[in-house]
Regions:
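Hydrophobic, well-ordered beta-alpha structural blocks that scaffold small-molecule cofactor pockets
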Residues: 1-109
Length: 109
């Protein structure tokens, strides 16, 4: 995985595509990278969808059917991305859903 540290690269890339507020689905190593990279930037993590509490960030259970609007939800549970994406689409959410892994791999330096 690319190293993102150094000067808020991830937040700049998200802001370029109009993303200011995100949610993360799943608490994985990718989640830890996203939290670290976005801490103190202009991009806010509004919540994480996970059954266990994540320190310092609002947590919504995976069983929830209602989600606060965000600009983008990044699914960090990459091994279950397709199933999670299909489940979330059934709720008629208005925001974009993307694989966190694919999103991060698609960033250009």
């Amino acid at each position: 995985m690319k190293t993102l540290s150094g000067g808020g690269y991830l937040s700049r890339e998200l802001l370029k595509i109009g993303v200011r507020n995100i949610a993360i689905y799943g608490n994985t190593e990718i989640t830890k990278v996203l939290v670290k990279e976005l801490n103190g930037t202009d991009v806010q993590i509004l919540y994480i969808v996970e059954n266990e509490r994540v320190e310092g960030i609002k947590t919504i259970p995976r069983s929830s059917t209602k989600f606060e609007d965000v600009d983008l939800m990044l699914v960090a549970d990459v091994s279950n991305f397709k199933q999670i994406e299909e489940k979330l689409k059934k709720f008629g959410l208005k925001f974009k859903i993307a694989s966190a892994y694919e999103f991060l791999m698609g960033l250009k330096n």
